[in-house]
Amino acid sequence: TPVGDLDKVFEAYRDLYSGPQREDSPETGVDMSMGYLYRLVAGCLIAGDLQKVEQGYVFCGEPLTNERPYFAGYLRIPDIPKFMDKLEAISDEWGYLLLWATLFLSVVFGLVLMLLPMIFGWQAFFQRHRGKPGVIVYFLCLGVGYIFVEIAMISKYILCLGNATVSVAILVTGMLLFSGLGSYLSARFVPAARRTIIVVCSSITLLLLFYASYLDRILGMVGLWPYGAKIVFCLLLLFPLALLMGFPFAIGMSTLSRLRKEHFFVWAWGINGSFSVVGSVLVPIISVSLGISTVIVMAAIIYLTALPSFFNLQLPDS
């Protein structure tokens, strides 16, 4: 059958590119000419078997969508090790491979910077205070979650605003302005920090899940509006989420101060900043493979994870 022949051709291509004996045995015994491959693929497409072609081809041949708008994103993650000694075959993907290298370096340096205070001179201090796991997880989640939302929303806003530069300017300006306002307002809620964090993190999670499901439709509805109106609408759409996202970091730092754990300040800032860098590298890696909305869903899960870690952070010293 054409499908069976196509499986053999795809397998031969994989052996040629990544098989253990590809250099010694270039002959596969299978007709690998472009004409034959074209006829087999065309036959499968006419028969409605697109999934067979997508799954069997050497590279990812799925059509581009607004969720995964990456023209050069044709390399599957499990296949990356197979191409390490044949990089000329995937020259368009070198930037993607550099992302993985950057991720490795950022995680390593982030962990080193996070552990340095515990190694040099602060052992006694860390032994005296409770809530250390909460400090680590809480501020790590805030760093990764915030940058996940920021970068994913930039990609979403491009659909409405039609320009990457404008999207970045509007999104970053709105996030910083509204989050700053949220941080300022959070001072009033520090005495009820536990209840406030429950409400804030739960609300952020629900908003992110809503945006992941419906943001594309909402932005599509305003696509024909005047450009100024679209900018105002995008800012208004961002306002409730960004305002709430300004609360957790400020309340976390204020809680440390109320518990007389000011020595954790530098550590918390460092963890938050280091893993913001890690998150900024993770976003394109995840969105290439799983889609931009998946990044927003992951951000929702991360903010929900920050909730129990805040309870541990609140533990008073014995």
Kindly give the residue locations of the regions a language model identified.
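Alpha-helical transmembrane segments of multi-pass membrane proteins
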Residues: 1-318
